[in-house]
Amino acid sequence: MKLNQDSLTSKFGSPIERVEQAIKSVQQGNGVLLLDDESRENEGDLIYSVDHLTSEQMALMIRSCSGIVCLCLTEDKADYLELSPMVEHNESVNQTAFTISIEAKKGVTTGVSATDRVTTIKTACKNGALPHELAKPGHVFPLRAKDGGVLTRRGHTEGTVDLMRLAELTPAGVLCEVTNSDGSMAKTPEIIIFAEQHHLPVLTVNDIALYRKEKSN
């Protein structure tokens, strides 16, 4: 019998418990696995906070995930850094809001290594970061999170920023899609295995939406 996402993720607790575990994980500098709806992309992303991001964590994203590392930012932060959309007309099925890619102007070599990508992310997200400190294009791909978070758009981007806000961290995070060893996209069963191998909590975008609604009541 094929189990659905709810059944597979239940081993990590109730939706509220899963969010609370994820909050604790990112506060402690660890990662989480975030799944979107089965009817949407039905994929899982490895996520870290920008506050605690390390080169070792970035290397795991590059080695065990798709390697396309994205930086989730609020609309205000993206505007402040003058990050224009990657394209004028977004034809993405899920309207993923990529901006032009970035690179730190200082402290990097080619920009592609794990250490260089962390430097770029830290440069963009530090207090007082300025647009002229970033070169464009680069090897880090910023994403704009919709205002309102997962209650507005049920994407990994919004889930990442919402989770960091719930954890009282900088409202920005890094994500990368988890892939299988054969190069295909990992689905929920494979995400669960990956999480257990790396001792990471699992939650869904829907969990975050339910948590936010409950806490607002």
Curated annotation (Swiss-Prot):
<feature type="site" description="Essential for catalytic activity">
    <location>
        <position position="139"/>
    </location>
</feature>
<dbReference type="InterPro" id="IPR017945">
    <property type="entry name" value="DHBP_synth_RibB-like_a/b_dom"/>
</dbReference>
<feature type="site" description="Essential for catalytic activity">
    <location>
        <position position="177"/>
    </location>
</feature>
<comment type="subunit">
    <text>Homodimer.</text>
</comment>
<feature type="binding site">
    <location>
        <begin position="40"/>
        <end position="41"/>
    </location>
    <ligand>
        <name>D-ribulose 5-phosphate</name>
    </ligand>
</feature>
<comment type="function">
    <text>Catalyzes the conversion of D-ribulose 5-phosphate to formate and 3,4-dihydroxy-2-butanone 4-phosphate.</text>
</comment>
<keyword id="KW-0464">Manganese</keyword>
<dbReference type="GO" id="GO:0030145">
    <property type="term" value="F:manganese ion binding"/>
</dbReference>
<protein>
    <recommendedName>
        <fullName>3,4-dihydroxy-2-butanone 4-phosphate synthase</fullName>
        <ecNumber>4.1.99.12</ecNumber>
    </recommendedName>
</protein>
<feature type="binding site">
    <location>
        <position position="177"/>
    </location>
    <ligand>
        <name>D-ribulose 5-phosphate</name>
    </ligand>
</feature>
<comment type="pathway">
    <text>Cofactor biosynthesis; riboflavin biosynthesis; 2-hydroxy-3-oxobutyl phosphate from D-ribulose 5-phosphate: step 1/1.</text>
</comment>
<feature type="binding site">
    <location>
        <position position="156"/>
    </location>
    <ligand>
        <name>Mg(2+) 2</name>
    </ligand>
</feature>
<feature type="binding site">
    <location>
        <position position="41"/>
    </location>
    <ligand>
        <name>Mg(2+) 2</name>
    </ligand>
</feature>
<dbReference type="GO" id="GO:0008686">
    <property type="term" value="F:3,4-dihydroxy-2-butanone-4-phosphate synthase activity"/>
</dbReference>
<dbReference type="GO" id="GO:0000287">
    <property type="term" value="F:magnesium ion binding"/>
</dbReference>
<dbReference type="GO" id="GO:0005829">
    <property type="term" value="C:cytosol"/>
</dbReference>
<feature type="binding site">
    <location>
        <position position="41"/>
    </location>
    <ligand>
        <name>Mg(2+) 1</name>
    </ligand>
</feature>
<comment type="similarity">
    <text>Belongs to the DHBP synthase family.</text>
</comment>
<dbReference type="Pfam" id="PF00926">
    <property type="entry name" value="DHBP_synthase"/>
</dbReference>
<feature type="binding site">
    <location>
        <position position="45"/>
    </location>
    <ligand>
        <name>D-ribulose 5-phosphate</name>
    </ligand>
</feature>
<dbReference type="GO" id="GO:0009231">
    <property type="term" value="P:riboflavin biosynthetic process"/>
</dbReference>
<feature type="binding site">
    <location>
        <begin position="153"/>
        <end position="157"/>
    </location>
    <ligand>
        <name>D-ribulose 5-phosphate</name>
    </ligand>
</feature>
<keyword id="KW-0686">Riboflavin biosynthesis</keyword>
<dbReference type="InterPro" id="IPR000422">
    <property type="entry name" value="DHBP_synthase_RibB"/>
</dbReference>
<keyword id="KW-0460">Magnesium</keyword>
<keyword id="KW-0456">Lyase</keyword>
<keyword id="KW-0479">Metal-binding</keyword>
